[in-house]
């Protein structure tokens, strides 16, 4: 009940983006019934993005939690049965939208794992696909390097705009971004400054031109090449924004290790740290 208009709109945008993601067949939306983010508003937002199957469950109207759960499960099972009848089709890489992320970083992230992701990104772009570079707070100190790669003056200016907005927001509450970034874990792993961390972070974007800057969770068009999404440095929130924007898969580098995933999109974990690869084998997919 505490959401105001911009927060509420963002919530609806993300839910609509999740429903529209290519990995999703259909959506069951569950609500309490008296929140600000009303069911009819959410349904409208979803229907503006996609015509996929959509069902609604309102707990207060269903007769309580247990009845609402039964109803939602029944709807979900119906959709699973329908989805199982679909036939897989091959699509070109140009239809692929890949999100890139880093978390639990250490020096091996910038030296090995992120450059590997950058090479992948360049290959996706060369094949006509789309790669999303995220985490605006981790461009700070390296934003001028990204801006030099902007495809247009508008993109150049937007890169500086999103970075400066984060810095200004922190100053408004008397904080400095460098007081919380790098994190204690980053420092324990060997990263010394925010600029060092940012230089490693932007390696995930390879060497391709930056063609666009998207707001958080907004629909990313296919065949866009390298683009930026204005996301926070918080890993689950950043990944959620890219998936809401249409990313079908996320490639995630980590030096110290992290289990962060996503319910809709596969999250492939890459590390450049052999100790982390050996220690967290159930969380890490690739040793870079």
Which sequence ranges carry the predicted segments?
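Metallocofactor- and cofactor-centric catalytic cores in central/energy metabolism, strongly enriched
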Residues: 1-288
